[in-house]
UniProtKB/Swiss-Prot annotation:
It is found in: Nucleus. GO terms for biological process: meiotic DNA double-strand break formation; meiotic DNA double-strand break processing; reciprocal meiotic recombination; sporulation resulting in formation of a cellular spore. Its cofactor is Mg(2+). Signal peptide: none annotated. GO terms for cellular component: nuclear chromosome. InterPro entries: Spo11/TopoVI_A, Spo11/TopoVI_A_N, Spo11/TopoVI_A_sf, TOPRIM_Topo6A/Spo11, WH-like_DNA-bd_sf. Mg(2+) binds at residues 144, 196. Transmembrane segments: none annotated. This is Probable meiosis-specific protein SPO11 homolog. Belongs to the TOP6A family.
Length: 303
């Protein structure tokens, strides 16, 4: 097993790369990369870690967007043939859950039990520090949006059977940390997901199931999509008022995703009707509507 690189070795490699870059023509990309080198060298020398969001806010004017930081960090790690963890870059934490889980730390550092109370979600801890997740739930439901998770949380008080389900939310496109949690428990629990019936909601499902470009190996292969589906909005034409017209970005995303056979029917349906449905619109009119759809969709989970 190869030895982990030392901080001084990483700093030395980055300084060498900086000198090479300085010999090239100046550009915004060059300035951005040099600023990131400077930050990572400082982190290595001080023995501190940061996540990509923290790095981004250290120099917003240079980095412009958080995705620039993410791409450059991945590029640097690839060039040096080391992991982001070796660079001192932690996972960005944004995923949350409602339920109770035990997190066993690496290197025998003990176990921490975390549970949500009063319907208040818990932040998923940094999974790079976790060796195992203790999960007693037979069913886990991934919810695309935290606004919908909040609605579900209010139903848990009324419907005690929902306490038997672990709810996880990646707040839109999931961070690596959220997917890592699900990957660690997918063989202990049936994992299902609730997503908008729109091209980008379906794309978010694909990120969970098939991985992203940056992390293709981090995926939840067993996750099933239980809603919102075409049949949910076709009932006696009762919900035709919830559709929003597709835009050019939606149409481009449909063309990208139709190659996934299991998703093509819903995608072609959206293109045919030139519309999409967000969960908030589908559930918002009556309190009973959320309860009705939620239990209907939960019945689709394979036990």
């Amino acid at each position: 097993m190869a030895l982990a690189p030392t901080s001084s070795a990483i700093s030395g490699s980055l300084r060498s790369s900086m000198l090479k870059l300085l010999m090239r023509l100046k550009s915004r990309t060059l300035a951005t990369r040099l600023r990131l080198y400077e930050i990572i060298i400082e982190m290595q020398e001080l023995g501190i870690t940061r996540n990509e969001r923290e790095i981004f806010y250290m120099d917003v004017n240079v980095f412009r967007t958080q995705s620039v930081v993410r791409r450059l960090v991945s590029s640097i790690a690839s060039e040096l043939q080391i992991s982001k963890h070796d660079l001192g870059v932690r996972n960005t934490l944004k995923g949350i859950f409602i339920g109770r889980l035990g997190f066993v730390r690496h290197h025998g550092l003990g176990m921490v039990e975390m549970s949500s109370k009063g319907g208040c979600p818990q932040l998923i801890p940094d999974m790079s520090d976790i060796a195992e997740v203790l999960c007693d739930y037979k069913k886990t439901v991934v919810v695309e949006k935290d606004t919908v998770l909040q609605r579900i949380a209010s139903e848990i008080e009324r419907e005690k059977c929902l306490e038997e389900i672990l709810f996880v939310c990646g707040k839109g496109y999931p961070c690596k940390n959220t997917v890592l949690l699900l990957k660690m428990i997918e063989h202990k629990t049936a994992v299902a997901g609730l997503f908008d019936l729109d091209p980008f909601g379906i794309h978010i499902f694909c990120i969970y199931k098939y991985g992203s470009k940056e992390t293709p190996d981090i995926r939840v292969e067993t996750i099933m999509r239980i809603g919102v589906c075409m049949e949910d909005v076709l009932e006696k034409n009762a919900y035709k008022d919830v559709f929003v017209k597709l835009n050019v970005h939606d149409l481009k995303m449909i063309n990208r995703l139709v190659r996934f056979g299991e998703l093509s029917a819903d995608l072609l349906f959206l293109r045919k009707i030139d519309g999409k449905v967000e969960m908030e619109a589908l559930f918002s009119k009556e309190p009973r509507r959320l309860r009705y759809f939620l239990f209907r969709m939960l019945e689709r989970i394979s036990s």
